Amino acid sequence: MIQVIHTNHTVIKIAKDNQSLAVFKNLNIPETIYKLTELYPTELILWCHTDWVPFINHEQINAICTSNSEIVSYSISEENYLSKNIGFVEQSIFIKFSKKVKIATWQMSSVIGMAHADVFSALKTTVKPVNDFDYFLNSIAKIAMPLGVFCYSNPNLLIERNAEI
């Protein structure tokens, strides 16, 4: 598993199996992920905001994303990247979901998440590596979901979910 630790717009650490790797200078987070998929095409890629690294659920992390066609993330915020203020963004708009359980959704988060390199590689020519990592992740999931990629929000990525950044 490759871990990409970031501060919203900048990669600060990359590790593979707890061994540090060189950070690619002058690349934003999505560009870094695309580069990692070229170098490690058979690996899971985990991303995590630096504030939440101490709360990564290492005991369950390997059991959370078990398929090459799955993308999982979790946001500690009640608000998604795409605000409810813009109107209809999802078919389940009138259903109130609990953030305490795993749910299917294309709305991803940069707080923490993971996907197999195959997911990113398949969409590399479709989704451009923009600077806004949340936008990038939501674009990947929104395009990938109808193509058969399972997209989830899973609170078990973190061991402690009661705090706010």
Task: Briefly describe each language-model feature range.
Residues 1-20, 159-160:
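N-proximal low-complexity "stem/linker" segments adjacent to membrane-targeting elements
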Residues 25-39:
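Glycine-rich, basic loop-to-helix element that forms the pyrophosphate-binding segment
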Residues 33-34, 61-62, 141:
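Short amphipathic alpha-helical segments and helix-helix/interface helices
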Residues 37-87:
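Conserved donor NDP-sugar-binding/catalytic core segment of glycosyltransferases
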Residues 79-83, 91-115:
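A recurrent flexible, glycine/aromatic-enriched loop bordering the glycosyltransferase active site
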Residues 110, 128-161:
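Catalytic donor-sugar/metal-binding loop of nucleotide-sugar-dependent glycosyltransferases
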Residues 119-120:
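A generic structural signal for short hydrophobic patches within well-formed alpha-helices
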